[in-house]
């Protein structure tokens, strides 16, 4: 898939194992994985961070194979899902950081341009999530209140 505001093609990807069964060396059960996910979510970790910790520290390659559901769906069933989707959250966080930088250095023209690009990505992604009903139809990105969304 190509990049939105870049000429790069983005060809790097990881290969998912063909076998869909749980590996024989896997020691954790589905309940233990779900407990770990809930425990890490209570600490304030995002779903991708939870997946990285489970992969690196506990040897769980794919939560979906072991637990039957993805991390986000497990959190959603427990009522602990984040209110903003993760990719939108990180774009808003980046826009807040650029805006904070622009307060200190107003003449940075390149950062102004990058802020426009990031905010256009935010608007496009918000429109997508509104059609998928993961965001309420009244949700709107406003630069003044964006810092409260990511704090």
Curated annotation (Swiss-Prot):
Database matches in InterPro entries: Ribosomal_uS15 (IPR000589), Ribosomal_uS15_arc_euk (IPR023029), Ribosomal_uS15_N (IPR012606), uS15_NS1_RNA-bd_sf (IPR009068)
GO biological process per UniProt: ribosomal small subunit biogenesis; translation
Gene3D superfamilies in the cross-refs: 4.10.860.130, S15/NS1, RNA-binding (1.10.287.10)
First and last residue of the signal peptide: none
Gene Ontology terms, MF aspect: small ribosomal subunit rRNA binding; structural constituent of ribosome
Protein's cellular compartments: Cytoplasm; Nucleus, Nucleolus
An example Gene Ontology CC term for this record: small-subunit processome
A Pfam cross-reference name: Ribosomal_S15
Nucleus is among the record's keywords: yes
Disulfide bonds: none
Alphabetical UniProt keywords: Cytoplasm, Nucleus, Ribonucleoprotein, Ribosomal protein
Family affiliation: Belongs to the universal ribosomal protein uS15 family.
Quaternary structure and partners: Component of the small ribosomal subunit. Part of the small subunit (SSU) processome, composed of more than 70 proteins and the RNA chaperone small nucleolar RNA (snoRNA) U3.
Name of protein: Small ribosomal subunit protein uS15
């Amino acid at each position: 898939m190509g990049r939105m505001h870049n000429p790069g093609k983005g060809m790097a990807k990881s290969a998912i194992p063909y076998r869909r069964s749980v590996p024989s060396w896997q020691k954790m059960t589905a309940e233990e994985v779900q407990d770990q996910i809930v425990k890490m979510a209570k600490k304030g970790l995002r779903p991708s961070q939870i997946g990285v910790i489970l992969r690196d520290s506990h040897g769980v390659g794919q939560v979906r194979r072991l637990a039957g559901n993805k991390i986000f769906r497990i959190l959603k069933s427990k009522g602990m899902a984040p209110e903003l989707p993760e990719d939108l959250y990180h774009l808003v966080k980046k826009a807040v950081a650029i805006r904070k930088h622009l307060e200190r250095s107003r003449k940075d023209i390149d950062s102004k341009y990058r802020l426009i690009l990031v905010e256009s990505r935010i608007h496009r992604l918000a429109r997508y999530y509104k059609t998928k009903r993961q965001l309420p139809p009244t949700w709107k990105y406003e630069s003044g209140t964006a810092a409260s969304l990511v704090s």
